[in-house]
């Protein structure tokens, strides 16, 4: 399905990003990864405009068209007590500005039937304390998704995925960690990669501007103290 398709994955050296990149490669795609971590991929900090320009130039020096862009790179997570102005701006640069600018750099080089997937988070709709930088960035990329879908109408489909608890080490949990999930388990990177490959395929050709939350049902579960055995402990 993806033989010889040109795929870009930001933050593709580890975790969900690496799983996505590996799955595309397994189906014959040519995958270009950018990540801060050293490796055989393009190494750079996507918060820097010049880095994104250099990366896009390298990709376009090898290919006329790009079929898939996966904006996956992870913004930092700091809360209101410890997050500085600079930290917050950095999180937004990685999580919102970089996805916008990378698409802008490549928008005139999108192949017919191109697809863009933005990796958000279930934190785009719910929060824990002291997560403001990450939550704001993930909310931003979710909103950016439907804006891009409209602006790129006829040129690319743009969708976002909001993962819940995804254990990148593929740990198998039991007890409360698993039972609390309506799906009965904690997620793993393949849960996200499978949806990415579906959304980028012709089978999803009538889906654009959408957000799909893959969280085992956690965001749909109402929890009150004393209900169903749940107790608030302080």
Question: For each predicted feature, which ranges?
Answer:
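Conserved NAD(P)H cofactor-binding loop of Rossmann-fold oxidoreductase domains
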Residues: 72-77, 217
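Substrate-binding pocket helix/loop in short-chain dehydrogenase/reductase
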Residues: 79-92, 177
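Active-site helix of classical SDR
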Residues: 103, 137, 145
């Amino acid at each position: 399905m993806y033989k010889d398709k040109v795929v870009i994955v930001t933050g593709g050296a580890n975790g969900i990003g690496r799983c996505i990149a590996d799955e595309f490669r397994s189906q014959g795609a040519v995958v270009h990864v950018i990540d801060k971590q050293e490796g055989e991929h393009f190494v750079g900090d996507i918060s820097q405009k010049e880095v994104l320009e250099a990366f896009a130039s390298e990709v376009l020096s090898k290919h006329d068209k790009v079929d898939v862009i996966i904006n996956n790179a992870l913004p930092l997570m700091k809360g209101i007590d410890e997050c500085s102005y600079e930290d917050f701006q950095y999180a937004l640069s990685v999580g919102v500005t970089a996805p916008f600018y990378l698409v802008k750099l490549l928008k005139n080089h999108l192949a017919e039937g191109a697809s863009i997937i933005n990796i958000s988070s279930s934190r785009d709709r719910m929060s824990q304390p002291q997560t403001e930088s990450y939550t704001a960035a993930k909310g931003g990329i979710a909103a950016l998704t439907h804006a891009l879908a409209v602006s790129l109408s006829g040129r690319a489909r743009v969708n976002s995925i909001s993962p819940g608890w995804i254990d990148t080490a593929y740990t198998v949990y039991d007890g409360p960690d698993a039972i609390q999930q309506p799906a009965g388990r904690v997620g793993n990177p393949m849960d996200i990669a499978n949806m990415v490959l579906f959304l980028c395929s012709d089978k999803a050709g009538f889906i654009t501007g959408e957000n799909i939350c893959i969280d085992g049902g956690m965001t749909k579960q109402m929890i009150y103290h004393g209900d169903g055995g749940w107790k608030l402990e302080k």
